Amino acid sequence: MNIGFIGYGEAAFNISLGLGREGITGIRATDAMMNHEVMGKQVHARAEEAGVTLVSTNKEIAQWADIVFAAVPSSFTMDVCNDIKECLRPGQLYVDVSASTPATKENIWEAIKDTGVLFADAAMLGSLPKDKHQVPITASGNGAAKFHELMTPWGMKITLAGEKAGSASAIKLVRSIFMKGIAALMIDTMQAADAYGVSDEIVASIGKSLDGIPFQSHLDRLVTGTALHCTRRAAELKGSVAMQEEAGLNPEMTLASKHGHEALAKYDFAARYVDTKPTRWQEIIEAIRVEK
C-alpha cells in the first residue's frame, strides 16, 4: 500500500510519523515550500524524522500512491485537485484533510468523480501533535468506508458520516462555532470577572449551573429558554456591555450575544407558548428554519 501526502505541514507530518511507528514504510510527500530558503528546512527536517521521501510534484504523488492525502491549507485544496485530477484512477483513494468548507469538498468531488477515484472528506477533530495518526477523524464521501477499512488496522480513529462529500467538514465547522465560540466567551467572561475581583465567585457560580448535567439537557434548556425570554435577556446583556466598557474591556462577544437574542424577538416565541412550553431545542430551530 503506497501512501502519499500532498502538503507536508503539521497534519501530514504528524499522521505520517504515527503511521511510521505503526510499521508503514515508504511514505512519500511533496510540499510547495520544500525548496523555500527558510521554510524548506522544516519540511526536510520533518521528512527525515518521519522517514518520508520527498518528491518534486503533486502529480508524482498522484501517479504513485494508492492513498493520496491532500493536506494543504484550505485556500489551496481546489488547486491541488485541479492539478492532479488527470492522474487519478479508478479504485484509488483520495483523502482531503483540509479544513475547507462543505461546498469546497463537494466541488472537489464534482471535479474528480468521473475518474473513478474514491473520495473521502476527512475532518480532523483533535490535537495532531498529541494524537498523531490517531487523531479523531470524521469521514464522509464515497471513499469514506474504504478509508476506514484500510486505515483503522493501522491505528487511525475514523468515524463514518455517510457518503456525501462535505458532511464531515460540516460537522467539523459547525462544531467549531460552539467550541471556539465558548472559548472566546470564557476569555471575555474571565476578563470581566478579573476586572471586578469576582473570579472565584464566577467560576463557582457557573460551575454550579453547568457541572454534572448532560450536554443535551443544557442544549434543550438554553435554546428553549432563550427563545422564550430573548427580549428580557437582551436587555440584561445591554447592562453587561456597559459594565465591560466601564472596565475598559472589549464587549465584542457580549454584543454578538445581545444581537443574537434581539434577532429572535421577531418570532415571538413567548406568545406561541402561552399554554405549553417547548422542551426540545428542535422545536425552536425548526420554527426559525421554516419562517426565516
Predicted feature locations:
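Rossmann-fold dinucleotide-binding core
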Residues: 100-180
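Helical "substrate-binding/catalytic lid" subdomain
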Residues: 171-277
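Rossmann-fold NAD(P) dinucleotide-binding segment
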Residues: 59-119
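NAD(P)+-binding Rossmann beta1-loop-alpha1 motif at the extreme N-terminus of oxidoreductases
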Residues: 1-64
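Conserved beta-strand segments of alpha/beta enzyme cores
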Residues: 26, 53, 93, 118, ...
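Short, basic/aromatic-enriched C-terminal tail that caps enzymatic domains
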Residues: 274-292
